[in-house]
Amino acid sequence: MEAAMLQPQSVAQAFLNNREFKSDARKAYLFQQMPATPIYSRPGSSCSQPPTLYSNGAHKTTMLDADVYDSHFPSTPPLSTSGSAIGSPKMFDALQTPINPMFSGLDGFPGKDLFDSVETSVLDWSSCASPPMTPVYIASHPLALQQSTSDLVSMTSCPSLSPSPSPAYARSIASEQDVDFCDPRNLTVSTGNPTLAPEFTLSNMGDADVKGANARPTFDFNPAISHDLPSFQNLDDLDSEDDFSNLVNIEATATGETTRPRACTGSSVVSLGHCSFDDELAFDDNDTFSFLPFPSADATTDVDDGHRDKKLKTSPKNDAVVASEPTDDEVEATSAASVSSESTVSSPSDDNSPTVSAPSRRGRKQSLTEDPSKTFVCDLCNRRFRRQEHLKRHYRSLHTQEKPFECNECGKKFSRSDNLAQHARTHSGGAIVMDLIEDHASHFDGSAMPVNAGDEFSYGKVMFQIGSEVSEITEDASDNKKKRKRTD
């Protein structure tokens, strides 16, 4: 019975017979039924593997030899003193310091209770296994009153140590000999007889200061030189200043103005070209130039030319019309001054007397050098010029005293045309006729000249005919070039 009942139940669990009434009755759909409880695989089965975890952290440190410091001494050398410690006397023997027992192990050292009071553990230096701390003097300790002065080390016996050590620690060194700690006070070596400086006394301090203040270092500026080495001797050539006395002779005059020529106009100054005037301005070696004097007590301001003519203010337009030159009087003064300078100025003498400078002159300084570029030579004075008009001007102004240029307003005559133009600016007139007066007859301008009526009529007729012919020619040319307009 039980077997017969289990078989249909197992089939019912596995399959479900589902018939749809709308579809064909002969077709039956069978599908698997999900179990009520989930099924898990066994933990130890082959299908379940633990997940693999990757760690990026640092690896665990592995100690290969843990007892390194138990069986070996430390790499740091033990505490010891040298023969030249600072503050200690210089000795040739040294006292070796015993090794600190905390590194070598305290064999047979009895264990210490963990619950000692703080005061006793601090004051009892022999109870700890570490190196002793810096000795301090504790005034509240009751044994400090009974401590004798023999336990304290004075400054004379050990000057490099503290004057107030701990009395408990000093007593523990004398009593406890089983713990071999390093006592800094026992590092002092035996006293010998070193070579030390004399003892410093306060009584001689004032005298030492006075001696140090009065002492001055002395230097020997004449050292002994061996015979095989060359020595520098004094240069006797530079002892005298006579060679440099006549290098620059500055004339102490107050009229030392570096000015442009008086005849320069505005246009010539702007263009920086005085080509018509500066061709003969090549200064020779004997000419002296005057500059502003240096502020010295010996400087005298002597003015050779006592008067100075007033320069008239002229408009720039008149300056640009005609380039003017110095007047005839100035040229004559220039020539006279140049002749006098030739006679007075001589070659520099051997003595140290200052050279006599030529008197200041107002005109241009003429060149007396034999310049090959100056091809025009004066027959009378052998002066050379670069241009022929310069030679003619020289002839008329100096030798012949010819004055062919005359002013129309006042009748004054001039040897040069630029002098006449400069003089004409003083008048208020208009046009100036600058012609050579060969027949010594003065000419007048057009306003004063009589004009014939026939000539005026003929001139007007000719001008009218020329104007009409020009107009006809222009009209014919315009008709030929005219295009035909498009007619719509």
Swiss-Prot record:
Keyword annotations: Cytoplasm, Metal-binding, Nucleus, Repeat, Transcription, Transcription regulation, Virulence, Zinc, Zinc-finger
One Pfam family here: zf-C2H2
Q: What is its main location?
A: nucleus
Query: SUPFAM superfamilies given for it?
Result: beta-beta-alpha zinc fingers
Q: Report C2H2-type zinc finger ranges.
A: 376-399, 405-427
- Gene Ontology MF term list: DNA-binding transcription factor activity, RNA polymerase II-specific; RNA polymerase II cis-regulatory region sequence-specific DNA binding; zinc ion binding
The record's statement on gene disruption is:
Shows remarkable defects in conidial yield and virulence. Decreases tolerances to hyperosmolarity, oxidation, carbendazim, cell wall perturbing and high temperature at 34 degrees Celsius. Significantly reduces the resistance of conidia to oxidation, hyperosmolarity, wet-heat stress at 45 degrees Celsius and UV-B irradiation. Leads th repression of conidiation- and virulence-associated genes and affects also expression of stress-responsive effector genes and cellular signaling factors.
- Where in or outside the cell? Nucleus; Cytoplasm
PANTHER family reported in the protein's UniProt record: MIP31509P (PTHR40626), RESPIRATION FACTOR 2-RELATED (PTHR40626:SF13)
Function summary:
Transcription factor that acts as a key downstream transcription factor in the HOG1-MAPK pathway. Plays crucial roles in the regulation of conidiation, virulence and multi-stress responses. Acts as a negative regulator of proteases, lipases, as well as of the red-pigmented oosporein production, and contributes to virulence and growth in response to external pH. Contributes to the ability to infect Rhipicephalus microplus (Acari, Ixodidae) via the cuticle-penetration requiring route involving proteolytic activity at the host cuticle.
Protein name as catalogued: C2H2-type transcription factor MSN2
Q: Which organism is it from?
A: Beauveria bassiana (strain ARSEF 2860)
Native organism taxonomy? Eukaryota, Fungi, Dikarya, Ascomycota, Pezizomycotina
Gene name per UniProt: MSN2
